């Protein structure tokens, strides 16, 4: 019984597309990280100013 080996070639020339999508993904990740940090900073500010009212409002809305 003979066994055949086959080699699969790469996508051939798609490296630029991969690099472009990687750069776009990195940019999107950085933007989302920045937006998340801004939101967390805003939450921290609210909690520093008025933690008790924040907790009361949360519990009144059905939070546990």
From Swiss-Prot:
Is modified by deamidation of its C-terminal glutamine to glutamate by the deamidase Dop, a prerequisite to the subsequent pupylation process. The keyword RNA-binding does not apply. It comes from the Bacteria. There is a cross-link at residue 64 (Isoglutamyl lysine isopeptide (Gln-Lys) (interchain with K-? in acceptor proteins)). Residues 1-37 are annotated as: Disordered. The modification Deamidated glutamine is found at residue 64. GO terms for biological process: modification-dependent protein catabolic process; proteasomal protein catabolic process; protein pupylation. One of its GO terms (molecular function) is protein tag activity. Residues 21-58 are annotated as: Mpa/ARC ATPase binding. Pathway: Protein degradation; proteasomal Pup-dependent pathway. Residues 23-52 form a coiled coil. Keywords: Coiled coil, Isopeptide bond, Ubl conjugation pathway. The keyword Coiled coil applies. NCBIfam families: pupylate_cterm. The glutamate must be located at the C-terminal position to be coupled to the lysine substrate. Fusion of Pup to a nonproteasome substrate targets it for proteasomal degradation in an Mpa- and proteasome-dependent manner. The N-terminal unstructured half of Pup provides a signal required to initiate unfolding and degradation by the proteasome but is not needed for pupylation, while the C-terminal helical half of Pup interacts with Mpa to target proteins to the proteasome. Protein modifier that is covalently attached to lysine residues of substrate proteins, thereby targeting them for proteasomal degradation. The tagging system is termed pupylation. Among the identified substrates are the FabD, PanB and Mpa proteins. Belongs to the prokaryotic ubiquitin-like protein family. Strongly interacts with the proteasome-associated ATPase ARC (Mpa) through a hydrophobic interface; the interacting region of Pup lies in its C-terminal half. There is one Pup binding site per Mpa hexamer ring; the K(D) measured is about 3.8 uM. This is Prokaryotic ubiquitin-like protein Pup.
């Amino acid at each position: 019984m003979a066994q055949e080996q086959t080699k699969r070639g790469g996508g051939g020339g798609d490296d630029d597309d991969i690099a472009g999508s990687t750069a776009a993904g990195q940019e999107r990740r950085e933007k989302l990280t920045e937006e998340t940090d801004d939101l967390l900073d805003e939450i921290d500010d609210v909690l520093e100013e008025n933690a008790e009212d924040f907790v009361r409002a949360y519990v009144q809305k059905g939070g546990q």
